[in-house]
């Protein structure tokens, strides 16, 4: 059985980011009432699978759970920015960044997450690749002290734990 154009768009999004949740698809691809049926059809077609609410592309075999969680957290922040009409679209990036988000003013914002215990190496990578417009996502407020390692300026620092509580950026 064939897949529809909208299902193909959903599948393309899941292939691109490897992991997402239904809310991410609703925000970036398809906010129609049929989105859940489209996702279910892709599962039935064995194009994607869902485990604990996380939608994964069928081609992903050896899941790195830390990397999966990073992708989901960055997409959570991007989805909130899109809901607030602060960004228009997103596209994938190479490390150390996860996505580039196009703002309403046609500027690009480069988003990455800094993991606990890896601050020194990840911040050094961000410093080396920082072109401006960088949004750093910290897992929690204990990581703030590491920001002094940066030699370049970042546009915004978001603490994910706080974001989860109040959905404010």
Identify the role of each PLM range.
Residues 13-14, 48-123:
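Nucleic-acid-binding surface
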Residues 4, 16, 27, 56, ...:
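Residue-identity detector for threonine
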Residues 1-65:
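Nuclease-adjacent, charged terminal/linker segments that flank catalytic cores
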Residues 39-43, 77-85, 129:
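Hydrophobic, Leu/Ile/Phe/Ala-enriched alpha-helical segments that form helix-helix packing faces
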Residues 3, 102-103, 127:
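Generic structural signal for beta-strand residues in well-ordered domains
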Residues 29-32, 105-106, 129-133:
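Short glycine/proline-enriched coil/turn segments at helix->beta-strand junctions
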Residues 169:
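Short, surface-exposed amphipathic charged segments that create phosphate/polyanion-binding patches used
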Residues 109-165:
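Catalytic cores of nucleic-acid endonucleases
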């Amino acid at each position: 059985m064939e897949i529809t154009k909208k299902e193909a768009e959903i599948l393309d999004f899941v292939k691109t980011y490897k992991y997402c949740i239904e809310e991410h698809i609703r925000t970036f691809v398809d906010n129609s009432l049929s989105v859940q049926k489209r996702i279910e059809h892709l599962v039935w077609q064995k194009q994607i699978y869902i485990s604990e609410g996380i939608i994964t592309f069928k081609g992903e075999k050896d899941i790195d759970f830390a990397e999966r969680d990073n992708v989901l957290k960055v997409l959570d922040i991007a989805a909130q920015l899109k809901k607030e009409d602060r960004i228009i679209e997103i596209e994938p990036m190479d490390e150390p960044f996860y996505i580039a988000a196009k703002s309403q003013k046609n500027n690009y914002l480069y988003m990455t997450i800094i993991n606990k215990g890896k601050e020194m190496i990840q911040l050094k990578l961000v410093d080396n690749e920082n072109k401006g417009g960088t949004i750093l996502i910290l897992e929690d407020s204990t990581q703030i002290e590491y920001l002094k390692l940066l030699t370049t300026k970042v546009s915004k620092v978001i603490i994910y734990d706080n974001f989860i509580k109040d959905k404010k950026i």
